[in-house]
Amino acid sequence: PRGRITQMIGIPTSGMTTLAHKIIANAQGGQGAAVYIDLSGTFDPDYAIRCGVMLDRLLLVRPKTITQTLDIARDLFNEGKLTLVLLDLLNERDTTRPRDVGTMLRKLHEPLAKSRTAALFLLNAPQRPQWQALEEYTDIRLLIQRQTWLYQERDIRGYRVQVTILKDKSSPGEKHIILDLTFDDAVKGNGA
């Protein structure tokens, strides 16, 4: 949701990056603009294109530290002109103290709430201690888990993922959604 934080948690090959790219592509529809803050340095432009991301309408930022990442995000939220800011924290190895990250997240909260921008944080499971404070500011928290590979004859054509809604401030209670992610740019499932 706009003006709020959504957190996606998963492990490599869980489908989280594919879903994130699909969310960016959706946000870019109707002239929306998105920013990908790539602290982990793992953004793959070719894969993003296959997921529908329009690179000419995506600003890619590669900060070096958590502090730079959150300062950039705060500045973007203050501008209030973006549809989506995605913060890819999957492989970050910064040693910023959890208390300092909590302070920076507090400074993000107000400008984000006043903006029309959605914030999407991508984090590995299990979470690193620095990001425990993020849970306080998160409106929606999703756990992404790959269930099985999908085959077409002998070839792997995709995978089935389970999205578990761990937290949703507007609709309490854990929920599960199954999605099929295929390598031909299609995402099908009961979560549409």
Where are these regions (language model features)?
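The Walker A/P-loop phosphate-binding site
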Residues: 1-55, 69-78
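Phosphate-binding/switch loop-helix module in NTP-utilizing enzymes
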Residues: 63-120
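Phosphate-binding/switch region of NTP-binding enzymes
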Residues: 110-113, 117-192
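Helical mechanochemical/support elements of P-loop NTPase systems and associated helical scaffolds
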Residues: 4, 16-19, 44, 65, ...
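Hydrophobic residues at beta-strand termini and immediately following loops
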Residues: 8, 61, 144
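Short, ordered loop/turn segments at secondary-structure junctions
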Residues: 39-41, 63-65, 89-92, 124-126, ...
